[in-house]
Design a protein with these regions (language model features):
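Classical nucleotidyltransferase
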Residues: 1-93, 183-189, 196
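Phosphate/ribose-recognition catalytic cores of enzymes acting on nucleotide-derived substrates
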Residues: 83-210
Length: 210
């Protein structure tokens, strides 16, 4: 490969049975003409930051903790598609996205979120740097869905444009609650109103990226 520099973590292992380490790599540096740069481990709250920890926290719904680890919120990107439009009937319209294949999703529940419209098929250029605030539900929507299909629905605050067919990025900031089945649409509407206020309080705080 004729590499000039080889950058590895301090616990780097390679080769058969992972017997090679940083010292092994350095022992070949002069022969093959490269320099070894070792990156120290990063820690957060006395825990080493790693892809394993990040995946674990996401799978447990702790999306807030991974923001400083990733340097950004964990996000989902996809095209806005037509749904059942039940949200609109209760006064809380949502932008629906299809799940991405091989994407790690947090557990079913409601999340405070930020939204960016990346590009549009019908309205021309969008500003990908403009951020909207909202609330996102991930799950099978048990109150109105009897098929158990995974859904991703986002209510964008103070937003009434038609964005069907456009590509959006949804950034998950914090889990508000787990998914729950309600006895009626009125109960769902009341809970969503509370969730929206909770999301607004969460999003009013500064999102820390260390």
């Amino acid at each position: 490969m004729r590499a000039g520099y080889v950058v590895v973590g301090s616990d780097y292992r390679f080769g058969r049975d992972r017997k090679g380490d940083v010292d092994t790599l350095r022992s070949y540096a002069d022969e093959y003409g490269y320099k070894v740069i070792v990156i120290d481990k990063l820690e957060q709250d006395d825990e080493v930051v790693s892809s394993t920890v990040i995946r674990k926290n996401i799978s447990e719904g702790d999306v807030r903790s991974v923001i400083p680890m990733l340097g950004r919120p964990y996000s989902m990107t996809g095209e806005v598609v037509s749904g059942k439009q039940l949200g609109r009937t209760i006064g809380i319209p949502t932008a629906n996205m299809l799940p991405e294949e091989r994407k790690l999703y947090p557990p079913a529940g409601v999340y405070a979120s930020r939204i960016r419209i990346i590009r549009g098929k019908h309205t021309g250029h969008e500003d990908p740097f403009r951020v909207y605030m909202g609330i996102t539900n991930i799950g099978d929507n048990p109150t109105v869905n009897d098929k158990g299909n995974i859904t991703i629905e986002t209510n964008i605050f103070d937003f009434d444009r038609n964005i069907y067919g456009q590509i959006i990025k949804v950034e998950l900031i914090e889990q508000i609650r787990g998914e729950k089945k309600f006895g009626s649409l009125d109960e769902l509407k009341a809970q969503m109103a509370n969730d929206i206020e909770t999301s607004k309080r969460i999003l009013a705080k500064k999102v820390l990226v260390k």
